[in-house]
């Protein structure tokens, strides 16, 4: 039996990854992290979506200690989430240092326990927003370390790594989940479901990607299939 663990936030990217995993694996487990995030509403959204989509199990792990160590606008109410600035340079204040290191490591431990061969995460280098822990180089390096440290071949999969937001919408549509992802996921840094606040970087990337996809569905779908190898 093929098993996978999805790092699941209830947002656009991880929900699209879950939809695909459910077609590619016999048993899919979801793991969501409570790290004291500003947008904690995502935890309830993730719980509802995991149940609705048919995950074998959904585990919420308390890692609120991360918020004590990692200073970010996502872990501090007194640091405002910046509005979207397409030309901004450097690492944004929404970056939570160590978050994906912790999430992927804990997900791998969970995968070890449930005998899953893969940990799936929705990080993406094309739209990585300046986050160093969304890069392919980082994921592969951590995967190598985890494999050595556990003496277990647990594979980190990144289905969205080389596709952009428009193509991520196409992937959701390919699996018949476009409307669900559009209406029921939570990507917004300010914790607003669906279209979100419309001001933060997450909302703008999501909206711009959707508009691009809807404006040119055939071309975007074809590009997505070419990059992912889907037929």
Curated annotation (Swiss-Prot):
GO terms for biological process: queuosine biosynthetic process. It comes from the Bacteria. Its EC number is 6.3.4.20. Keywords: ATP-binding, Ligase, Metal-binding, Nucleotide-binding, Queuosine biosynthesis, Zinc. ATP binds at residues 8-18. It catalyses: 7-carboxy-7-deazaguanine + NH4(+) + ATP = 7-cyano-7-deazaguanine + ADP + phosphate + H2O + H(+). Signal peptide: none annotated. Zn(2+) binds at residues 188, 197, 200, 203. InterPro entries: QueC (IPR018317), Rossmann-like_a/b/a_fold (IPR014729). Binds 1 zinc ion per subunit. Catalyzes the ATP-dependent conversion of 7-carboxy-7-deazaguanine (CDG) to 7-cyano-7-deazaguanine (preQ(0)). Belongs to the QueC family. This is 7-cyano-7-deazaguanine synthase. The gene is queC.
